[in-house]
């Protein structure tokens, strides 16, 4: 893939690796309550990485690409920590599911540039439901899904790029903010 001037937009990376460990556990504490947890701890690296940044003069005339050798860098969109906890309550027709997820810092380029990164975040969702047995149709379940229970401000995606204009590096970052506290209601009819 190429830009209008002919330089590459993306490149294959010959020396990279992902290594880590994934853990998960679940425990039924009582017939009506269970606890689950998971975590992924990883290293996501590029060896001998060179970043290529488009360079322009002060009048935005294209001068070429500047090579910036970074050595070992971090793969984009690859947090080193992802973890979650799940609490599941269910008594007769009532159910409650509380899920908290933590996602570590992510870069959205391979350049390990803090100006082009996503902050870590932790978000909690709650699902509540009640199911009634209905003799003629099977069952009816009423549910409420409460997303972002603690009203966390976070972005879970973004993109960006760097350029050098008139000898000064400029980093342009764009983010996708996620919804604050919100509620969805639902009804499920089973035949």
Model-flagged regions — what are they?
Residues 31-33, 81, 92-94, 122-124, ...:
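Outer-envelope beta-barrel architecture signal
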Residues 102-108, 130-191:
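C-terminal beta-signal and adjacent terminal beta-strands/loops
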Residues 110-116:
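Short, surface-exposed loop/helix-turn segments at secondary-structure junctions
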Residues 9-110:
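Gram-negative outer-membrane beta-barrel transporters
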Residues 71-74, 114, 170-174:
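Short, P/G- and charge-enriched loop/turn segments at secondary-structure junctions
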Residues 1-5:
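Conserved small/polar residues in nucleotide/adenosyl-binding loops
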Residues 44, 113, 149:
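Hydrophobic pocket-lining residues within nucleotide cofactor-binding pockets
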């Amino acid at each position: 893939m190429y830009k209008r001037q002919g330089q590459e937009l993306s490149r294959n990376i010959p020396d990279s690796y992902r290594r880590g460990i994934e853990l998960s556990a679940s425990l039924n504490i009582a017939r009506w309550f269970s606890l689950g947890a998971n975590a992924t701890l990883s290293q996501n690296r590029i060896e001998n990485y060179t970043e290529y940044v488009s360079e322009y003069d002060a009048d935005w005339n294209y001068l070429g690409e500047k090579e910036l050798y970074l050595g070992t860098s971090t793969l984009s969109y690859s947090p080193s920590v992802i973890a979650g906890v799940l609490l599941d309550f269910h008594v007769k027709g009532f159910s409650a599911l509380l899920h908290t997820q933590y996602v570590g810092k992510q870069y959205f380029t391979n350049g390990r540039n803090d100006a082009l990164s996503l902050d870590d975040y932790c978000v909690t969702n709650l699902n509540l439901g009640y199911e009634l047995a209905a003799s003629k149709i099977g069952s009816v379940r009423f549910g409420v899904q409460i997303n972002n229970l603690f009203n966390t401000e976070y972005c879970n995606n973004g993109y960006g790029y760097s350029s050098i204009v008139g000898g000064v590096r400029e980093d342009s970052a764009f983010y996708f903010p996620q919804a604050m506290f919100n509620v969805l209601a639902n009804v499920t009819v089973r035949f």
